[in-house]
Amino acid sequence: MLKFTAEHEWLELDGDVATVGITTYAVEQLGDLVFVELPEVGKSFSKNDDAATVESVKAASEVYCPLDGEITAVNDAIVADPSLINSDPQGAGWFFKLKLKNRADADGLLDEAAYKELIA
């Protein structure tokens, strides 16, 4: 199930694990990404904590943790090649996997239709 935040993160939910990245809209606003800093595996975050950083030719931006949980994996490929985020932000450009503290919290996030309305 795909969910979104008002801060332009996407989550692909699989049970109690969410794969997290930034949306195509966010990438279009940032421009070409040149640097990514990811969180440590095993680190716990609360909703809206700064979890990662992206830098583009235009600006630096925080990527927020969309829900309470623990980082179980990070995408090292985007650290080596940040352009993967530009070319496939909602696929190969994922940032981290988050084991959710409470799966039901995801119900409060935006669905795709609501997110598209937000960015329209």
From Swiss-Prot:
GO terms for cellular component: cytoplasm; glycine cleavage complex. The modification N6-lipoyllysine is found at K58. Keywords: Lipoyl. Binds 1 lipoyl cofactor covalently. GO terms for biological process: glycine decarboxylation via glycine cleavage system. Its cofactor is (R)-lipoate. The glycine cleavage system catalyzes the degradation of glycine. The H protein shuttles the methylamine group of glycine from the P protein to the T protein. The glycine cleavage system is composed of four proteins: P, T, L and H. PANTHER family: GLYCINE CLEAVAGE SYSTEM H PROTEIN (PTHR11715), GLYCINE CLEAVAGE SYSTEM H PROTEIN-RELATED (PTHR11715:SF3). This is Glycine cleavage system H protein. It comes from Rhizobium etli (strain CIAT 652).
